[in-house]
Amino acid sequence: MSLLKMEYNLYTELKKMTCGQSLSLFNEDGDFVEVEPGSSFKFLIPKGFYSSPSVKTSLVFDTLTTTDNKITSINPTNAPKLYPIQCKVVSEVVSNMRKMIELKRPLYITLHLACGFGKTITTCYLMAIHGRKTVICVPNKMLIHQWKTQVEAVGLEHKISIDGVSILLKELKTQSPDVLIVVSRHLTNDAFCKYINKHYDLFILDESHTYNLMNNTAVTRFLAYYPPMMCYFLTATPRPSNRIYCNSIINIAKLSDLKKTIYVVDSFFEPYSTDNIRHMIKRLDGASNKYHIYTEKLLSVDEPRNQLILNTLVEEFKSGTINRILVITKLREHMVLFYKRLLNLFGPEVVFIGDAQNRRTPDMVKSIKELNRFIFVSTLFYSGTGLDIPSLDSLFICSAVINNMQIEQLLGRVCRETALLDRRVYVFPNTSIKEIKYMIGNFVQRIISLSVDKLGFKQESYRKHQESDPTSACTTSSREERVLNRIFNSQNR
């Protein structure tokens, strides 16, 4: 730990990484406070901040020669086989770590690698190279299985803990596995933090972007007060301010043969309203809609839009154009609505729900990986980050209010490299609720722009449903005619 006075140059360097956000650190009294410019107080500067050689310091950090926490079950022949691009990452990491050891810098590296790159297998390879006892920390239980599979493939002795840190601490009195796979809430226990700081050298923070380290979280406190000897942050969408805790980044672009298309499903809707909708519309401009809760609630009861989403999905699925579908909503009630309707159409052998409230969901996710055809309905919170179903070929985004980081993570669910190259994403920019029409259009346009400009998707308009259904075309025509008549009549008046 480094308690330092906040001099001007140090403050400037740290503040630069927050990208305009407030800078918050632990002070010498252990309080997590905002750092003001010109402050005369001392603050705990994270160890990982000094991993970048561009940060000048006279501090000297311990290297691995000071510990003896080595993996006993390591077998080099079990190291996973990597693609050339993954080997390039390993080479970069090894080269950077040699320089860090030479300069006596902390061995902290952020692996900023695209969704579908294979961060898990690449990191397991690095783990085998280092041969050091390791803690793998994941934000939720759903990510544990993919780590378990890769760690077992490497042949490492490991233990998974999801049932509570107290139980784990009792078990660690009689056993000392080479690899611990835990959920991040374990870090709220100081005794556990002290244990892994003493007995484990390598700490892997999976999906590091899910933690805002400018907040006083368990992960923030762990990295500040119990900093590991070595640390990897893994992410496809790094959070800029988290660099303060892990300031060395490796980012290698990945070329892909995937054919990625985002289909914009446009439709004209007559205004739709119910008592419930009118009640929620009154809350749109209030404080209760600060995070667009009511905007998404309105979308969940927008019956014409929901029917369009279902019609499009059913048509594409029945035609065989898409086979392994992820349907994403923002709200749980919206997820349940789609699940029930799809279940009635296709049955429980095809339709599954990714419900965070169901403890059996992770096991169900494992079981559907082998299916040739399925529809998986879930929420952005549960499946937007880290969902491990590599065979997904299509994504239906039913919500609209999604930030850039979530968009990139979500689209990454259908960008995993497999033998089948076609990937399709469907978005729905229209709504029948006129009070949110422009807002929804703008939010969906942001999804489209990011997918095309940053992730290499090709944008196309989806016309199949309207063209294949003559009654739909007639309905649209008559609707347009009525709208034109109203405009004409109002002008005459």
UniProtKB/Swiss-Prot annotation:
Spell out the subcellular localization from the entry.
Virion
Q: Where is this motif: DESH box?
A: 206-209
Q: Which GO terms describe its molecular function?
A: ATP binding; DNA binding; helicase activity; hydrolase activity
Q: Which UniProt keywords apply?
A: ATP-binding, DNA-binding, Helicase, Hydrolase, Late protein, Nucleotide-binding, Transcription, Virion
Locate the residues binding ATP. Answer: L113, A114, C115, G116, F117, G118, K119, T120
**Entry's EC annotation:** 3.6.4.-
InterPro entries according to UniProt = Helicase/UvrB_N, Helicase_ATP-bd, Helicase_Restrict-Modif_Enz, P-loop_NTPase
Q: What does this protein do?
A: DNA helicase which seems to act as a postreplicative transcription termination factor. Involved in ATP-dependent release of nascent RNA. Forms a stable complex with single-stranded DNA, and to a lesser extent RNA.
State the protein's name: Transcript termination protein A18
The species this protein belongs to is Camelpox virus (strain M-96)
Q: What is the organism lineage in this UniProt record?
A: Viruses, Varidnaviria, Bamfordvirae, Nucleocytoviricota, Pokkesviricetes
